[in-house]
């Protein structure tokens, strides 16, 4: 029983300070690969694996065709094209998205995921001063 389709959209950025949030030296990542992963609430196998690549502004769009009422769906980082900013940190590499139509959300089937980030292995030298400003 397929429900209406959804478009999941969001942005991928590089966190050069490993801050866990965007700073004035963060930048969007073009050409990053993200996947949508859905698994049952009861912890079974993850099901849907739709992938997309980010555009020049770091945005992606993934079309998904059925309702995932009984599932937890997340957008997960898969691959960074930028070798200097390609570290993935567990739990910070994903954003949960509601993919059901009965959650009172009626945005023409568009679901916005929170921005997710790749990290630099070594923070930039100027990060100490930058982070003090936040």
Swiss-Prot record:
Taxonomic superkingdom: Eukaryota
Chief place where the protein resides: secreted
Organism: Lolium perenne
Glycosylation: residue positions: 24
This protein's record includes keyword Flavoprotein: no
Disulfide partners: 14-85, 17-127, 38-73
Listed GO CC annotations: extracellular space
Record protein name field: Major pollen allergen Lol p 11
Localization per record: Secreted
InterPro entries: Allergen_Ole_e_I_CS (IPR006040), Pollen_Ole_e1_allergen (IPR006041)
PANTHER family documented for this protein: OS06G0556600 PROTEIN (PTHR31614:SF12), PROTEIN DOWNSTREAM OF FLC-RELATED (PTHR31614)
Keywords: Allergen, Disulfide bond, Glycoprotein, Secreted
PROSITE patterns listed in its UniProt record: OLEEI (PS00925)
Entry similarity comment: Belongs to the Ole e I family.
């Amino acid at each position: 029983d397929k429900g209406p389709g959804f478009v999941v959209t969001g942005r991928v950025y590089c966190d050069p300070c490993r801050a866990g949030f965007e700073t004035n030296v963060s930048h969007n990542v073009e050409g990053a690969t993200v996947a949508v992963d859905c698994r049952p609430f009861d912890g079974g196998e993850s099901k849907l694996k739709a992938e997309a690549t980010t555009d020049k502004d770091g945005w992606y769009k993934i079309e998904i065709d059925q309702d995932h009422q009984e599932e937890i769906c997340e957008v997960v980082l898969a691959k960074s094209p930028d070798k200097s900013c390609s570290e993935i940190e567990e739990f910070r590499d994903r954003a949960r998205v509601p993919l059901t139509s009965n959650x009172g959300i009626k945005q023409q089937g568009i679901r916005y995921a929170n921005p997710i980030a790749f990290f630099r292995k070594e923070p930039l030298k100027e990060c100490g001063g930058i982070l003090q400003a936040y």
